Amino acid sequence: MYSIPSTPQPIMKKLLLSLCSIALLNSCDDGDLTLETINFDSATAQECSLNNVVYKINGNQLLLIEIPATSLPYENKIGDKTFTINSNNKVIYRGYNNTVSSASICSTIPPASPSVTEEWNAIAGTISIQTTAIYSAANALTGAIKISKYRHAITFNNITFAKSNGNQVYETFVFGDYDTNATALPMNFNPDSIQLCSSGQTLYNAQSGGIEGLYIQNLSSNLLDSTVLGIAKTALINTNNENLLTYRLFSLALTLGGNSTYFCASPLPDSPLVKEEWTGQAGVSNTSGIIEVTTTTNGSGYSHSIHLKSVTFSNPLAGSTFYYGDDILIGTLLSN
Protein backbone atom coordinates (compact mmCIF):
# COMPACT_ATOMS: atom_id res chain seq x y z
CA MET A 1 0.00 0.00 0.00
CA TYR A 2 1.31 3.41 -0.93
CA SER A 3 1.51 5.84 2.02
CA ILE A 4 1.97 9.62 2.01
CA PRO A 5 5.47 10.43 3.23
CA SER A 6 5.77 12.59 6.35
CA THR A 7 7.13 16.14 6.02
CA PRO A 8 10.88 16.21 6.73
CA GLN A 9 11.68 17.58 10.21
CA PRO A 10 13.97 20.44 9.01
CA ILE A 11 11.17 21.79 6.81
CA MET A 12 8.70 21.61 9.68
CA LYS A 13 11.05 23.55 11.92
CA LYS A 14 11.54 26.27 9.33
CA LEU A 15 7.78 26.50 8.80
CA LEU A 16 7.13 26.82 12.51
CA LEU A 17 9.77 29.54 12.88
CA SER A 18 8.26 31.46 9.96
CA LEU A 19 4.77 31.31 11.41
CA CYS A 20 6.02 32.49 14.80
CA SER A 21 7.32 35.74 13.28
CA ILE A 22 4.36 36.65 11.07
CA ALA A 23 2.52 39.16 13.27
CA LEU A 24 3.21 41.62 16.04
CA LEU A 25 0.77 40.10 18.45
CA ASN A 26 1.16 36.39 18.67
CA SER A 27 2.34 33.71 21.03
CA CYS A 28 4.05 30.54 19.91
CA ASP A 29 4.89 27.45 21.96
CA ASP A 30 5.88 23.83 21.22
CA GLY A 31 2.95 23.03 18.96
CA ASP A 32 0.24 25.72 19.19
CA LEU A 33 0.09 29.02 17.29
CA THR A 34 -2.19 31.80 18.58
CA LEU A 35 -2.51 34.89 16.38
CA GLU A 36 -3.98 38.07 17.85
CA THR A 37 -3.72 41.51 16.29
CA ILE A 38 -4.56 45.04 17.38
CA ASN A 39 -4.28 48.01 15.07
CA PHE A 40 -4.69 51.66 16.02
CA ASP A 41 -2.74 53.17 13.12
CA SER A 42 -5.69 55.16 11.76
CA ALA A 43 -7.00 56.25 15.18
CA THR A 44 -6.40 59.76 16.55
CA ALA A 45 -4.87 60.09 20.01
CA GLN A 46 -7.03 61.96 22.52
CA GLU A 47 -6.69 62.95 26.17
CA CYS A 48 -8.95 62.74 29.21
CA SER A 49 -8.36 66.04 30.99
CA LEU A 50 -9.53 64.68 34.35
CA ASN A 51 -7.06 61.82 34.68
CA ASN A 52 -4.26 62.64 32.21
CA VAL A 53 -4.98 59.50 30.18
CA VAL A 54 -4.03 59.54 26.50
CA TYR A 55 -5.88 56.95 24.45
CA LYS A 56 -6.86 55.67 21.02
CA ILE A 57 -10.13 54.04 20.01
CA ASN A 58 -10.67 51.67 17.10
CA GLY A 59 -14.24 50.35 17.04
CA ASN A 60 -14.59 48.13 20.08
CA GLN A 61 -10.91 48.36 21.06
CA LEU A 62 -9.12 50.87 23.25
CA LEU A 63 -5.44 51.45 23.97
CA LEU A 64 -4.51 53.84 26.76
CA ILE A 65 -1.46 55.37 28.40
CA GLU A 66 -1.57 56.76 31.92
CA ILE A 67 1.43 58.73 33.20
CA PRO A 68 1.10 61.07 36.21
CA ALA A 69 0.73 64.72 35.23
CA THR A 70 3.50 65.59 37.68
CA SER A 71 5.92 63.77 35.38
CA LEU A 72 5.08 66.24 32.57
CA PRO A 73 4.93 63.57 29.86
CA TYR A 74 3.38 65.85 27.24
CA GLU A 75 5.12 69.09 28.09
CA ASN A 76 5.42 71.64 25.28
CA LYS A 77 9.17 71.26 25.25
CA ILE A 78 11.26 69.90 22.40
CA GLY A 79 13.22 66.78 23.31
CA ASP A 80 12.98 63.11 24.24
CA LYS A 81 11.60 61.49 27.38
CA THR A 82 11.52 57.87 28.49
CA PHE A 83 9.26 56.36 31.15
CA THR A 84 9.59 52.88 32.61
CA ILE A 85 6.31 50.95 32.61
CA ASN A 86 5.29 50.21 36.19
CA SER A 87 2.42 50.76 38.61
CA ASN A 88 2.59 54.52 37.96
CA ASN A 89 3.24 54.57 34.22
CA LYS A 90 0.62 52.31 32.69
CA VAL A 91 -0.25 50.96 29.25
CA ILE A 92 -3.51 49.03 28.94
CA TYR A 93 -5.34 47.43 26.02
CA ARG A 94 -9.06 46.69 26.33
CA GLY A 95 -11.57 44.94 24.12
CA TYR A 96 -15.29 45.67 24.53
CA ASN A 97 -18.47 43.90 23.52
CA ASN A 98 -19.59 46.90 21.47
CA THR A 99 -18.33 50.17 20.02
CA VAL A 100 -16.50 52.13 22.69
CA SER A 101 -16.44 55.92 23.21
CA SER A 102 -14.46 58.38 25.31
CA ALA A 103 -17.12 58.14 28.02
CA SER A 104 -15.91 54.63 28.83
CA ILE A 105 -12.52 55.93 29.87
CA CYS A 106 -12.96 59.63 30.69
CA SER A 107 -16.17 59.66 32.75
CA THR A 108 -15.99 59.72 36.53
CA ILE A 109 -18.60 56.95 36.47
CA PRO A 110 -18.16 54.89 33.27
CA PRO A 111 -21.36 53.76 31.50
CA ALA A 112 -22.53 50.19 32.09
CA SER A 113 -22.35 49.47 28.38
CA PRO A 114 -20.25 48.56 26.51
CA SER A 115 -18.51 46.21 28.90
CA VAL A 116 -14.90 45.04 28.90
CA THR A 117 -14.44 41.56 27.44
CA GLU A 118 -10.66 41.46 27.43
CA GLU A 119 -7.88 43.44 29.11
CA TRP A 120 -4.12 43.31 28.69
CA ASN A 121 -1.93 45.15 31.20
CA ALA A 122 1.63 46.06 30.31
CA ILE A 123 4.01 44.71 32.95
CA ALA A 124 7.40 45.65 31.47
CA GLY A 125 9.03 47.89 28.90
CA THR A 126 9.42 51.62 28.34
CA ILE A 127 7.38 54.48 26.88
CA SER A 128 9.39 56.77 24.62
CA ILE A 129 8.02 60.25 23.85
CA GLN A 130 9.73 62.45 21.26
CA THR A 131 8.41 66.02 21.16
CA THR A 132 8.77 68.41 18.21
CA ALA A 133 7.21 71.75 17.26
CA ILE A 134 4.71 71.99 14.40
CA TYR A 135 4.63 75.33 12.59
CA SER A 136 1.94 77.27 10.77
CA ALA A 137 2.27 78.35 7.17
CA ALA A 138 3.97 81.70 6.71
CA ASN A 139 1.65 84.69 7.03
CA ALA A 140 0.99 86.01 3.53
CA LEU A 141 1.44 89.65 4.62
CA THR A 142 4.20 89.57 7.22
CA GLY A 143 5.96 86.26 6.61
CA ALA A 144 5.50 85.38 10.28
CA ILE A 145 5.70 81.67 11.14
CA LYS A 146 4.22 80.63 14.46
CA ILE A 147 4.22 77.41 16.45
CA SER A 148 0.72 75.95 16.10
CA LYS A 149 1.19 72.84 18.24
CA TYR A 150 3.63 70.36 19.70
CA ARG A 151 3.70 66.78 18.47
CA HIS A 152 4.53 63.95 20.85
CA ALA A 153 5.55 60.79 18.96
CA ILE A 154 4.96 57.85 21.31
CA THR A 155 6.60 54.44 21.01
CA PHE A 156 6.62 51.43 23.34
CA ASN A 157 9.91 49.54 23.49
CA ASN A 158 10.27 45.93 24.66
CA ILE A 159 6.76 46.08 26.06
CA THR A 160 5.25 42.97 27.66
CA PHE A 161 1.48 42.60 27.97
CA ALA A 162 0.03 40.16 30.49
CA LYS A 163 -2.95 38.41 28.87
CA SER A 164 -5.32 35.73 30.06
CA ASN A 165 -3.50 33.11 27.98
CA GLY A 166 0.09 34.23 28.61
CA ASN A 167 2.41 37.14 27.93
CA GLN A 168 2.83 39.01 24.66
CA VAL A 169 6.04 40.91 23.89
CA TYR A 170 6.64 43.66 21.34
CA GLU A 171 10.17 44.77 20.62
CA THR A 172 8.75 47.99 19.14
CA PHE A 173 5.13 49.12 19.16
CA VAL A 174 4.38 52.53 17.63
CA PHE A 175 1.46 54.12 19.48
CA GLY A 176 1.54 57.18 17.22
CA ASP A 177 1.33 60.95 17.59
CA TYR A 178 -0.43 62.95 20.26
CA ASP A 179 -0.69 66.71 19.63
CA THR A 180 -0.99 69.50 22.19
CA ASN A 181 -1.79 73.12 21.40
CA ALA A 182 0.96 75.69 21.72
CA THR A 183 0.36 78.62 24.05
CA ALA A 184 -1.21 81.43 22.05
CA LEU A 185 1.06 84.48 21.94
CA PRO A 186 -1.13 87.49 21.02
CA MET A 187 1.79 89.69 19.85
CA ASN A 188 -0.77 92.45 19.48
CA PHE A 189 0.99 95.78 19.96
CA ASN A 190 -0.34 99.25 19.16
CA PRO A 191 2.53 101.27 17.64
CA ASP A 192 1.30 104.36 19.52
CA SER A 193 1.79 102.60 22.87
CA ILE A 194 5.58 102.44 22.65
CA GLN A 195 7.45 104.30 25.39
CA LEU A 196 11.04 105.13 26.31
CA CYS A 197 12.18 104.88 29.93
CA SER A 198 13.74 108.01 31.42
CA SER A 199 17.13 106.30 31.32
CA GLY A 200 16.92 106.41 27.54
CA GLN A 201 18.07 102.80 27.41
CA THR A 202 14.82 100.79 27.45
CA LEU A 203 12.03 100.85 24.90
CA TYR A 204 8.81 98.99 25.69
CA ASN A 205 5.39 98.41 24.21
CA ALA A 206 2.57 97.06 26.36
CA GLN A 207 -1.09 97.76 26.76
CA SER A 208 -2.04 99.22 30.13
CA GLY A 209 -3.56 96.33 32.07
CA GLY A 210 -2.53 93.94 29.29
CA ILE A 211 -1.03 90.45 29.52
CA GLU A 212 2.02 90.86 27.28
CA GLY A 213 4.95 93.15 26.76
CA LEU A 214 7.75 93.68 24.26
CA TYR A 215 10.88 95.50 25.38
CA ILE A 216 14.41 96.34 24.27
CA GLN A 217 17.09 96.97 26.89
CA ASN A 218 20.50 98.62 26.39
CA LEU A 219 19.22 100.40 23.30
CA SER A 220 21.95 101.59 20.92
CA SER A 221 22.32 105.35 21.38
CA ASN A 222 22.46 106.08 17.65
CA LEU A 223 18.99 104.69 16.93
CA LEU A 224 17.09 107.69 18.33
CA ASP A 225 19.55 110.32 17.10
CA SER A 226 17.37 113.27 16.05
CA THR A 227 20.13 114.85 13.97
CA VAL A 228 19.84 112.10 11.36
CA LEU A 229 16.52 112.63 9.58
CA GLY A 230 14.82 110.57 6.89
CA ILE A 231 17.57 107.95 6.81
CA ALA A 232 17.11 104.49 8.32
CA LYS A 233 19.44 103.79 11.26
CA THR A 234 20.04 100.15 12.05
CA ALA A 235 21.49 97.97 14.77
CA LEU A 236 21.63 94.25 15.46
CA ILE A 237 19.60 92.55 18.19
CA ASN A 238 21.35 90.95 21.15
CA THR A 239 24.86 91.79 19.97
CA ASN A 240 27.66 93.04 22.25
CA ASN A 241 25.13 93.22 25.09
CA GLU A 242 23.10 95.83 23.21
CA ASN A 243 19.49 95.86 21.97
CA LEU A 244 18.37 92.99 24.17
CA LEU A 245 14.94 92.15 22.76
CA THR A 246 12.48 90.23 24.94
CA TYR A 247 8.82 89.25 24.73
CA ARG A 248 6.92 88.30 27.88
CA LEU A 249 3.49 86.74 28.28
CA PHE A 250 2.11 87.17 31.80
CA SER A 251 -0.13 84.89 33.85
CA LEU A 252 -2.00 87.94 35.16
CA ALA A 253 -2.56 91.40 33.74
CA LEU A 254 -0.13 94.24 34.26
CA THR A 255 -1.25 96.90 36.70
CA LEU A 256 -3.32 99.61 35.06
CA GLY A 257 -1.13 102.66 34.51
CA GLY A 258 1.89 100.82 35.89
CA ASN A 259 3.79 99.91 32.75
CA SER A 260 6.68 102.31 33.38
CA THR A 261 7.03 101.03 36.95
CA TYR A 262 7.41 97.51 35.60
CA PHE A 263 9.49 97.89 32.43
CA CYS A 264 11.78 100.68 33.66
CA ALA A 265 12.73 98.90 36.88
CA SER A 266 16.09 97.18 37.25
CA PRO A 267 15.79 94.30 37.74
CA LEU A 268 12.24 93.79 36.48
CA PRO A 269 9.68 92.96 39.20
CA ASP A 270 8.65 89.37 40.01
CA SER A 271 4.96 90.27 39.68
CA PRO A 272 2.98 89.62 37.59
CA LEU A 273 4.26 86.09 37.09
CA VAL A 274 5.81 85.45 33.68
CA LYS A 275 4.06 82.61 31.86
CA GLU A 276 6.42 82.51 28.89
CA GLU A 277 9.53 84.48 27.95
CA TRP A 278 11.03 84.65 24.47
CA THR A 279 14.24 86.43 23.51
CA GLY A 280 15.32 87.73 20.14
CA GLN A 281 18.10 85.74 18.53
CA ALA A 282 21.35 87.56 17.86
CA GLY A 283 21.25 89.53 14.63
CA VAL A 284 23.33 88.88 11.55
CA SER A 285 24.49 91.91 9.55
CA ASN A 286 22.27 92.64 6.52
CA THR A 287 20.43 89.35 7.08
CA SER A 288 18.37 89.00 10.26
CA GLY A 289 17.67 90.31 13.74
CA ILE A 290 17.73 93.97 12.75
CA ILE A 291 16.26 97.02 14.49
CA GLU A 292 15.58 99.85 12.07
CA VAL A 293 14.61 103.37 13.13
CA THR A 294 13.71 106.22 10.79
CA THR A 295 13.38 109.67 12.36
CA THR A 296 11.34 112.53 10.89
CA THR A 297 10.18 115.89 12.18
CA ASN A 298 6.80 116.09 13.90
CA GLY A 299 5.83 119.71 14.54
CA SER A 300 8.43 121.04 16.96
CA GLY A 301 9.50 117.50 17.87
CA TYR A 302 10.37 114.21 16.24
CA SER A 303 8.74 110.94 15.28
CA HIS A 304 10.79 107.72 15.38
CA SER A 305 9.36 104.82 13.36
CA ILE A 306 10.76 101.61 14.89
CA HIS A 307 10.78 98.34 12.96
CA LEU A 308 11.98 94.82 13.70
CA LYS A 309 13.24 93.04 10.59
CA SER A 310 13.63 89.30 10.13
CA VAL A 311 13.56 88.62 13.85
CA THR A 312 13.42 85.11 15.30
CA PHE A 313 12.45 84.60 18.93
CA SER A 314 13.67 81.66 20.97
CA ASN A 315 12.59 80.06 24.24
CA PRO A 316 15.54 78.16 25.75
CA LEU A 317 13.32 76.41 28.30
CA ALA A 318 11.14 74.92 25.56
CA GLY A 319 13.90 74.56 22.97
CA SER A 320 11.59 76.33 20.50
CA THR A 321 11.81 79.23 18.08
CA PHE A 322 9.37 81.21 15.95
CA TYR A 323 9.75 83.82 13.22
CA TYR A 324 8.23 87.21 14.07
CA GLY A 325 8.08 88.47 10.50
CA ASP A 326 9.95 90.17 7.68
CA ASP A 327 9.28 93.77 8.70
CA ILE A 328 7.16 94.55 11.77
CA LEU A 329 6.39 98.07 12.99
CA ILE A 330 6.54 97.86 16.79
CA GLY A 331 6.14 101.54 17.57
CA THR A 332 6.10 105.17 16.59
CA LEU A 333 7.88 107.06 19.38
CA LEU A 334 7.40 110.81 19.75
CA SER A 335 10.14 112.94 21.29
CA ASN A 336 10.99 116.61 21.73
Report the location of each language-model feature:
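N-terminal amphipathic/basic-hydrophobic helices that include classical n-h-c signal peptides
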Residues: M1-I11, T246, N259-T261
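A structural detector for beta-sheet-dominated domains
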Residues: N58, N86, Q130-T132, N157, ...
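Bacterial Sec-dependent N-terminal signal peptides
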Residues: Y2-P8, L17-K56, N336
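Surface-exposed beta-loop interaction hotspot
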Residues: T172-N218
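Surface-exposed helix/loop patches within compact recognition domains
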Residues: N52-K146, G210-G301
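Short, hydrophobic/proline-enriched secondary-structure or compact coil segments at domain edges
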Residues: L50-Q61, H152-T155, S199-G210
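Ser/Thr/Pro-rich, low-complexity mucin-like regions
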Residues: G143-A184, N298-Y323, L334-S335
